[in-house]
């Protein structure tokens, strides 16, 4: 009997299965044809097969089984279409009429499809009303502008609308959305909307549960303005606080100001509140503790002040994510020692909160995944109990505190991300760190006082990708287990330590490394052969060590090398030709060595290059093709000779430094074509002739954005080792379904880009000293130095057009004539040196208009007249005017009452001054000859005085003869 029952049950299941199979219908032909038509208009023919390989046009092909298509199993009609992320035609306009055959479509995904607009020649703006069942529309990451809202207003059935990362700007067009009364989720993040947020208009969307306006430029106050304040769009009480169904609200990364409105507490169903990266002020209201449904609270990166107590969050039993950070230094986070919270956090970030100890309530947290307590004043031992209590902890950020003891757990942990940089650790680095944290992907212990050798246990971190041990006092050789065991390493920073030995004399397992920083150590010997195996290496910095020998030719054969820095060593010999024929190389710094030989005649790079070869023993001439691809060329203090070449293709060069060589001849007129020049230094050579007036045509920043120059080189790589886990996925047991944004509930710090960079440092003389400039300071420096040459003639009047120039040095030449009044137009000038020349006439009083001038030198010229006073000229001392006997007034001690100091105004032409000087020289010569003739005539007479004179001469001659014999 039991067997029959069992058989009956099986027959029933078989019959049900057959019924289901019989009820399944393939897609209908009309929609199949429409899908092919849609593909033809959106995907190029050459890409369609590779993008959608399952889309075949044979009779047996069921379009319901195609990639990106889903159908109703009973009717066979298409319900979902997804072209998201496919390679669509660039700037394509979508013809909405192509969608009309899909009457039952509920979800349409065209995200990341490069669409730029919609159109329908028949239905116009009302086209989307044809799709009566459309509920989900994803148009994120395209190129749509505000005109799309005219079409969207007809899609009244929509419940979910994604428009993030498009080209929308200006005022937010809320009126076009007010008819979408079924909307539950609206994502307009990462656009360029500005002005006030029109919450009053959005209040008609009564069903709205999730609103994301993050990453825009919205401004205005979030303070309660009052229900009857009709002239303010951002009326919180009559707007956002009436959205009673709101569960997620993200207004982060905008420019909102003011205090948090107290009426937010009326949104009792709120589960996600993100107001981070705004300019909110005031105290953090304790009333947030009444939002008992809250799971995600981020007030990160604002300007909150006053004190904040965790006790105010006592009733938030569902809280899992808490982020608080203030750019203001007056926020004080209090920690109650006896308080035990009801919640179990997964993420806590309390950055820049002026905390002096780890919050006590964290002792009761057992499910933490991410802890950020950086930028505080916490001292004492590293809280290893956080790791012991939270076995799922993946990220621990404790940088920029005052920890003194690096205490780690006694047993192994699964931590992935550890940053303890910039603390006060004053003892040895943990020997067993590699055994305790074998799964680390990111480790930063830089800017501490760690000493002794690097522990060999580091080699156990075979998954480590980023390691920064720089700016400590580590010494000794690199452990062999370390260079062989960390085979996943991508970026390694060992800079500014006391490490010694040879650099990779043998092969290593760092085959995946992209950036290797070993500068400012005590490494010795030759450049090791082990570097040859680093085939993915992009950036190599070995500067400021004690390396000897020659630069091996194979180093230029590393296939991915982009930046090579070996400055400040003891290298000698020629520069390998391979470095000048490497197309990928963008930064080559071989300065401050003993390299000799010549620069190869060709540079094969296709990109802008920074070439730093100063302070060597290089000789010969400069190839005239060298500047074709170079942006920065520094050849200072070498032994180059000959003429400065008539460079070709010089439009890319922005910094040209040739100081301290043996260049002769005139300044080539080709340099007048330096359309992007920022710094020009030709000083301390033997250049002669006049200064080309056409140098005034060079840019020196005029008409350029200050950000147009970027001399910092870096590398970055995306890491997917963390993947960022979604709270909705990891904690779904206490959710009722969910409409959560993954962008809100994904732990974004876990999926990060690793970055490493080196800043180009340039030395330039301003204000009578050499300073090194880099980063933002370098971008703002515009200067020309032609000093210490043999230049003659006058200062070009046209130089007054160099309006952006900050520093001009023409000292130690043979310049004559007057100081041009046009110099007064150079309003940004800070340093102006004309000393040790032959300039004449008065100092133009118009120069007092140079309000930025801090250094002015005209000493040792032939200037005359009254020294101008006022503004910056009141700050210059007498040293600025030494060697000009005809100058008077302050700050010299010479009175101007004597007529001998009077001189014709600078309105007198320069050639008139020259005539005066010629007359002076002729008069001086005539007087000298007259005196000499008078002496000789007196000696011709026979007198006691003449006999005495001849006696003395004979005695002197006899004495000299005796000394020689």
Curated annotation (Swiss-Prot):
Keyword Oxidoreductase: no
Glycosylation sites: 57, 95, 109, 145, 194, 315, 377, 389, 444, 509, 546, 581, 652, 662, 688, 697, 809, 814, 862, 893, 898
Mode of membrane association: Single-pass type I membrane protein
Any single GO CC term annotated in Swiss-Prot or TrEMBL for this entry: plasma membrane
Chief site of localization: membrane
Signal peptide as annotated in the record: 1-23
Keyword Membrane: yes
Keywords, alphabetical: Cell membrane, Glycoprotein, Leucine-rich repeat, Membrane, Receptor, Repeat, Signal, Transmembrane, Transmembrane helix
Pfam families: LRR_1, LRR_8, LRRNT_2
Transmembrane segments: 917-937
Subcellular localization, as worded in the UniProt entry: Cell membrane
Extracellular-side positions: 24-916
Coiled-coil ranges (or none): none
Domain of life: Eukaryota
Residue intervals annotated with topology Cytoplasmic: 938-965
InterPro entries: Leu-rich_rpt, Leu-rich_rpt_typical-subtyp, LRR_dom_sf, LRR_N_plant-typ, RLP_Defense_Trigger
The LRR repeat ranges on this chain: 80-102, 103-127, 131-154, 156-179, 180-204, 206-230, 243-267, 268-290, 292-315, 316-341, 342-365, 366-389, 391-415, 417-435, 437-461, 462-485, 487-512, 514-533, 534-557, 558-582, 584-606, 608-627, 628-652, 654-674, 675-698, 778-801, 802-825, 827-850, 851-875
Recorded family membership: Belongs to the RLP family.
Name of protein: Receptor-like protein 15
Organism this protein belongs to: Arabidopsis thaliana (Mouse-ear cress)
Lineage, uppermost ranks: Eukaryota, Viridiplantae, Streptophyta, Embryophyta, Tracheophyta
Gene, per the UniProt record: RLP15
């Amino acid at each position: 009997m039991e067997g029959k029952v069992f058989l009956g049950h099986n027959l029933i299941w078989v019959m049900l299965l057959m019924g289901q199979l019989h009820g399944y219908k393939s897609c209908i032909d009309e929609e199949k044809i429409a899908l092919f038509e849609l593909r033809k208009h959106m995907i190029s023919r050459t890409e369609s097969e590779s993008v959608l390989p399952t889309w075949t046009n044979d009779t047996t092909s069921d379009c319901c089984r195609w990639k990106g298509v889903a159908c109703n199993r009973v009717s066979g009609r298409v319900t979902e279409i997804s072209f998201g992320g496919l390679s669509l035609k660039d700037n394509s306009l979508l013809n909405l009429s192509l969608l009309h055959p899909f009457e039952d479509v509920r979800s349409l995904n065209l995200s990341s499809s490069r669409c730029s607009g919609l159109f329908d020649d028949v239905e116009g703006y009302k086209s989307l009303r044809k799709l009566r069942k459309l509920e989900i529309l994803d148009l994120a990451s395209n190129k749509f502008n505000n005109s799309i809202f005219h079409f969207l207003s007809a899609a009244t059935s929509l419940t979910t609308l994604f428009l993030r990362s498009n080209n929308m700007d200006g005022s937010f067009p809320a009126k076009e959305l007010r008819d979408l009364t079924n909307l539950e989720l609206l994502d307009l993040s990462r656009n360029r909307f500005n002005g006030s947020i029109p919450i009053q208009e959005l209040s008609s969307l009564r069903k709205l549960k999730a609103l994301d306006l993050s990453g825009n430029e919205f401004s205005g106050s979030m303070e309660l303005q009052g229900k009857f304040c009709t002239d303010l769009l951002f009326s919180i009480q009559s707007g956002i606080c009436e959205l009673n169904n709101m569960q997620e609200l993200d207004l982060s990364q905008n420019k909102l100001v003011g205090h948090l409105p107290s009426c937010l507490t009326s949104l009792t169903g709120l589960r996600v509140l993100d107001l981070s990266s705004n300019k909110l002020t005031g105290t953090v209201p304790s009333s947030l503790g009444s939002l008992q449904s809250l799971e995600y609270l981020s007030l990160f990166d604002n300007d909150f002040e006053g004190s904040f107590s965790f006790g105010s969050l006592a009733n938030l039993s569902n809280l899992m994510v808490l982020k608080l950070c203030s750019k203001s230094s007056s926020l004080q986070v209090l920690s109650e020692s006896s308080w035990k919270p009801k919640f179990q956090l997964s993420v806590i970030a309390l950055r820049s909160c002026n905390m002096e100890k780890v919050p006590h309530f964290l002792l009761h947290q057992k499910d933490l995944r991410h802890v950020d307590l950086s930028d505080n004043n916490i001292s004492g031992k590293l809280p290893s109990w956080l790791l012991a209590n939270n076995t799922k902890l993946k990220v621990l950020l404790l940088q920029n505190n005052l920890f003194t003891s690096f205490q780690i757990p006694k047993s192994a942990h699964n931590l992935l991300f550890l940053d303890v940089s910039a603390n006060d650790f004053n003892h040895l680095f943990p020997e067993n760190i590699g055994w305790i944290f074998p799964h680390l992907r990111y480790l930063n212990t830089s800017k501490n006082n760690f000493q002794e050798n690097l522990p060999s246990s580091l080699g156990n971190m075979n998954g480590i990708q980023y390691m920064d041990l720089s700016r400590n006092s580590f010494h000794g050789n690199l452990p062999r287990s370390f260079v062989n065991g960390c085979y996943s390493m991508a970026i390694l920073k060992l800079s500014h330590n006391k490490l010694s030995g040879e650099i990779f004399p043998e092969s290593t397992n760092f085959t995946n490394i992209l950036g290797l920083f070993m500068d400012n150590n005590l490494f010795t010997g030759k450049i090791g052969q082990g570097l040859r195996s680093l085939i993915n290496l992009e950036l190599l910095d070995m500067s400021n060590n004690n390396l000897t020998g020659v630069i091996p030719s194979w180093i230029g054969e590393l296939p991915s090398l982009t930046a090579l820095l070996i400055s400040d060593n003891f290298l000698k010999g020629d520069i390998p030709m391979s470095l000048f024929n490497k197309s990928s190389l963008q930064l080559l710094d071989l300065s401050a060595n003993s390299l000799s030989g010549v620069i190869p005649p060709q540079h094969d790079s296709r990109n802008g290059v920074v070439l730093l070869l100063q302070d060597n023993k290089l000789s010969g001439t400069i190839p005239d093709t060298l500047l074709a691809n170079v942006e920065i060329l520094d050849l200072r203090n070498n032994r180059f000779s000959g003429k400065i070449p008539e460079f070709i293709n010089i439009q890319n060069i922005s910094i040209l430094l040739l100081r301290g060589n043996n260049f002769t001849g005139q300044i080539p007129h080709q340099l007048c074509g330096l359309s992007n020049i920022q710094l020009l230094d030709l000083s301390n050579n033997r250049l002669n002739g006049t200064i080309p007036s056409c140098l005034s045509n060079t840019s020196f920043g005029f008409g350029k954005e200050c950000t147009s120059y970027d001399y910092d080189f870096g590398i970055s790589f995306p890491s997917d080792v963390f993947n960022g886990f979604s709270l909705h996925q990891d904690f779904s047991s206490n959710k009722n379904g969910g409409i959560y944004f993954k962008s809100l509930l994904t732990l974004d710090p876990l999926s990060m880009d690793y970055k490493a960079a080196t800043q180009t440092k340039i030395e330039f003389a301003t204000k009578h000293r050499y300073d090194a400039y880099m980063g933002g300071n370098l971008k703002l420096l515009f200067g020309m130095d032609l000093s210490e040459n043999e230049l003659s003639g006058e200062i070009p009047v046209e130089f007054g057009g160099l309006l952006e120039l900050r520093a001009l040095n023409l000292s130690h030449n043979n310049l004559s004539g007057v100081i041009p009044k046009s110099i007064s137009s150079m309003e940004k000038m800070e340093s102006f040196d004309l000393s040790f020349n032959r300039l004449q006439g008065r100092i133009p009083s118009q120069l007092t208009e140079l309000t930025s001038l801090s250094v002015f030198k005209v000493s040792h010229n032939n200037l005359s007249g009254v020294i101008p006073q006022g503004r910056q000229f009141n700050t210059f001392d007498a040293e600025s005017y030494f060697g000009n006997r005809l100058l008077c007034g302050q700050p010299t001690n010479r009175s101007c009452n004597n007529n001998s100091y009077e001189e014709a105004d600078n309105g007198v032409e320069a050639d008139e001054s020259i005539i005066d000087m010629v007359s002076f020289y002729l008069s001086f010569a005539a007087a000298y000859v007259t005196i000499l003739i008078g002496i000789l005539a007196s000696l011709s007479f026979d007198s006691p005085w003449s006999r005495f004179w001849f006696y003395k001469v004979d005695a002197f001659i006899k004495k000299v003869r005796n000394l020689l014999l």
